[in-house]
């Protein structure tokens, strides 16, 4: 698997990866929440982070990671390739090449919490709401 740089013209494809991943792993998020977050991600979140992606043999993005100030701000993988090492490769790259040492993860996504713990992250603290004030508890984790 090769890590590639992301260009702004990749954002629409990445948003599809985000939505696919969220629908598969974030059962607590409603359709209204997904539609609320889409423009925020496209217009604010993607441009604010250093983005890297993994593509499949046909050149389609199957996962991506975004890092800012040593924090993994986003890591999403297409549900169809979960468990195939894409997330591991992206997170290792974020740690080794982008100096990532922190991540916030939805407490209601136990698969992600377990993945980050397996990768060496430990829970430091918990917030009862997310950054947007929504009732999604967040675990603050560090290496």
Range-by-range predicted roles:
Residues 11, 16-43:
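Conserved GNAT-fold acetyl-CoA-binding loop/helix
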Residues 72-82, 106:
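A short, internal acetyl-CoA/4′-phosphopantetheine-binding micro-motif in the GNAT/acyltransferase core
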């Amino acid at each position: 698997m090769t890590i590639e740089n992301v260009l702004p013209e990749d954002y629409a494809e990445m948003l599809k990866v985000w939505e696919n991943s969220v629908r598969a792993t974030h059962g607590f998020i409603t359709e209204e929440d997904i539609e609320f977050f889409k423009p925020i991600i496209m217009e604010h979140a993607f441009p604010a982070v250093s983005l890297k992606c993994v593509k499949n043999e046909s050149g389609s993005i199957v996962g991506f990671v975004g890092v800012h100030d040593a924090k993994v701000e986003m890591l999403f993988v297409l549900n169809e390739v979960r468990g195939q090492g894409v997330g591991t490769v992206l997170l290792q790259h974020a740690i080794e090449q982008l100096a990532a040492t922190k991540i916030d993860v939805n407490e209601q996504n136990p698969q992600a919490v377990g993945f980050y713990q397996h990768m060496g992250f430990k829970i430091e603290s918990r917030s009862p709401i997310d950054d947007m004030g929504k009732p999604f508890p967040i675990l603050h984790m560090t290496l």
